[in-house]
Every structure is written in structure tokens, then in C-alpha cells.
Regions:
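Extreme N-terminal starter segment of soluble prokaryotic enzymes
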Residues: 1-4
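Active-site metal-binding loops of divalent metal-dependent hydrolases
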Residues: 9, 154, 200-202
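Active-site-proximal alpha-helix that buttresses catalytic centers in soluble enzyme cores
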Residues: 10-69, 75
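Glycine-rich phosphate-binding loop signature in dinucleotide/nucleotide-binding domains
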Residues: 44-46, 137-146
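Short beta-strand scaffold positions
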Residues: 52-53, 128, 151-152
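Phosphate-handling substructures
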Residues: 68-129, 198
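Acidic, low-complexity terminal tails and accessory targeting/binding regions
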Residues: 75, 82-96, 143-146, 162-214
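GST superfamily/GST-like fold recognition
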Residues: 154-158, 183
Length: 214
């Protein structure tokens, strides 16, 4: 089994440095362009089926990548983004950022001391649900020889890859930065064991990176 795990394309909230979490924000024009370029780059890669977070930005990314293919695409709640509760919608960029942004930014800068709001998820809860998804598909004999697209989000994708690496740490959750929009990581699952083959593949060109919405 080969997984192609992709982070969704850009949204307006990504561009504005607003906290998304499970708030359902669609792709913007640039995000769709990234997904289209990724689809073009992956056109020679066979894909048998896909799983997507039900959130619009991930689902639309998967639909664009799989356009023109007769491939089933299944909603999978376990790979949706972590919930940030009342922090969702916070503006975290610039001098006029929201007062709570400092507490939220510990999620990225000081993860071991990040305290989620009462109505949010913890990192261990994220590890558990994304791990449940990974364990289930790894054990399915009907998927053993399939190529599978998995369309998800920055933190959810990181939790999946951390589990594959054997890292379930909260303090060291972020190995690097958040995966870029529409970056693709290739994972092989064989005899129930997963390994990362290629990480952070980008299929869009440098000129597309610089393209901006009007």
C-alpha cells in the first residue's frame, strides 16, 4: 500500500494568519491553483481511492487532484484538523493581532506548554484519532496493493507522520515547520508497518508559488 498524504491548498484564513482548526473555510483562488498544479504533477501516479477530511479545504483539494479519474473518495472525520475551540478565528499576525494569540502561538513555538481551551482538542487526542485511522487502513487486506490519496491538514498530517516515525511526543510535535500547502508525502505500508519514502514533495513551480490572488 502506498499513501500520498497531502495538505490542503491555501485559504484566505491561511493568508490572513487566522486560526482555522475545524472552522470550515474553502480554498481561495491561489489554493485551487496549487491543487491544480499538484494534480498535473501527479497525473502519471496511479490512484485507486482517496480519503479526505470532510472540511471543505481538504475535500476540494482532493477533488481537484482526482478530477478526471474514476476514483472513489471517502470522507474520514479522523483526519480532519485539530479543534482549537474558541481560538478559531483569532488573528495571529501583525501588531494588531488578537490578545489570545500569544497563548495560541505556544501550539507552534512552545508546544509542551500549550494549553488548549476547554472546548478544544489536545495533541494526545489528535494522535489517538489519526492513529486510529492509520491502524485501520494498515490492517485492511483489501487495501494492501492500493495507491491511496489522503487529503488532510497541517497538524493532522504532522500527527500521522510523527506516529510513523515513532514520535508521540507533545513537546516535540513539530519536527520542522507546518507542511506547505499542497505538499505531498509518500508513505509505504507493508506487512502492517509504515515508512516514509518521500516527504514534502512540491509539484507546483516557483512562479506559481509567487502567484497571488487579486
Amino acid at each position: 500500500m502506498i499513501l500520498y498524504i497531502v495538505r490542503h491548498g491555501e485559504t484566505d484564513w491561511n493568508k490572513m494568519h487566522k486560526v482555522q482548526g475545524q472552522t470550515d473555510i474553502p480554498l481561495n483562488d491561489y489554493g485551487r491553483r496549487l491543487a491544480e498544479e499538484t494534480a498535473q504533477g501527479m497525473k502519471k501516479i496511479p490512484v485507486d481511492l482517496g480519503f479526505t477530511s470532510p472540511l471543505l479545504r481538504a475535500k476540494e483539494t482532493a477533488q481537484i487532484i482526482l478530477a478526471g479519474r474514476s476514483v472513489p473518495l471517502y470522507d474520514e472525520e479522523r483526519i480532519q484538523e485539530i479543534s482549537f475551540g474558541r481560538y478559531e478565528g483569532l488573528y495571529c499576525g501583525g501588531e494588531d493581532r488578537d490578545p489570545d494569540s500569544e497563548a495560541f502561538n505556544r501550539f507552534f513555538n512552545d508546544t509542551g506548554n500549550y494549553i488548549p481551551p476547554e472546548d478544544a482538542e489536545t495533541i494526545p487526542q489528535l494522535y489517538e484519532r489519526t492513529g486510529s485511522f492509520l491502524r485501520e487502513i494498515s490492517s485492511r487486506e483489501d487495501l494492501a496493493d492500493k495507491n491511496i490519496l489522503v487529503s488532510t491538514h497541517g497538524a493532522a498530517m504532522t500527527s500521522l507522520l510523527n506516529r510513523i516515525r515513532g514520535n508521540l511526543s507533545v513537546e516535540h510535535f513539530w519536527k520542522d515547520e507546518v507542511p506547505p500547502n499542497c505538499s505531498v508525502t509518500m508513505v509505504e505500508i507493508k506487512d502492517g508497518k509504515a515508512q516514509i519514502l518521500k516527504e514534502g514533495m512540491i509539484f507546483y513551480k516557483e512562479k506559481v508559488k509567487k502567484w497571488k490572488t487579486v
